[in-house]
Design a protein with these regions (language model features):
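N-terminal beta1-alpha1 ligand-phosphate binding loop
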Residues: 2-27
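A structural signal for isolated positions on well-ordered beta-strands in alpha/beta enzyme cores
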Residues: 4-5, 33-35, 89
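Hydrophobic residues within alpha-helices
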Residues: 18-26, 105, 150, 154
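Short helix-loop-beta junction
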Residues: 19-32, 110-115
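Generic structural signal for well-ordered alpha-helical scaffold segments
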Residues: 23, 72, 76-77, 155, ...
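A short beta-strand-loop structural module common to alpha/beta enzyme folds
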Residues: 31-43
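Glycine-rich phosphate/pyrophosphate-binding loop and the adjoining helix
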Residues: 43, 117-163
Length: 163
């Protein structure tokens, strides 16, 4: 059984919904075990025990959220050189753009020598005021379907040995 680790951080619920959608779809794929972890609790042992990854983060001030960055910081050197070539997918929950956060996360996982199996999935909530940015989010059904597709694709690819 191949293990898919989904690591996320969410302050307003948007990224959590995305990660849960990916996890639910991935869990439906035979031959794959899904481990959904919040960034604050995930660590190097989780990363080493997985065969593939989905990283899901909100974009805060044009960067990945602090707690997601903390996860990468805590895990980077303990797993460096030990997970080369493993597949990953990336999901960003953004207010308007998301490209800088995606670029930042991609640079980090490039250092780990991970292999992207899809373009980063950026979901824009269009939250532009302080009130809207801090408010609980509800991710649109069509965007959640994209998250499900990413999770299912990674799980199926791992189970079949395609990645």
């Amino acid at each position: 059984m191949k293990a898919l680790l989904i690591v996320y951080h969410s302050l307003t619920g948007g990224t959590r919904q995305m990660a849960e959608a990916a996890a639910k779809a991935a869990a439906a794929e035979p031959g794959a075990e899904v481990r959904l972890r919040q960034a604050i609790t995930a660590g190097p042992d989780d990363v080493l025990a997985a065969d593939g990854y989905v990283f899901a983060a909100p974009e805060n001030l044009a960067a990945v959220s602090g707690l997601m960055k903390d996860f990468f910081d805590r895990c980077y050197y303990p797993v460096l050189g030990r997970i080369n070539g493993r597949p990953y997918g990336l999901m960003i929950c953004a207010g308007s753009d998301g490209t800088n956060a995606a670029r930042q996360a991609m640079r980090i996982v490039t250092g780990w020598r991970l292999r992207a199996v899809a373009e980063p999935l950026i979901v824009c909530t269009h939250a532009q005021t302080p009130e809207a940015i801090l408010a609980p989010k509800v991710i649109a059904t069509n965007d959640l379907e994209k998250c499900r597709t990413l999770g299912a694709t990674l799980a199926a690819g791992l189970a079949m040995g395609a990645f």
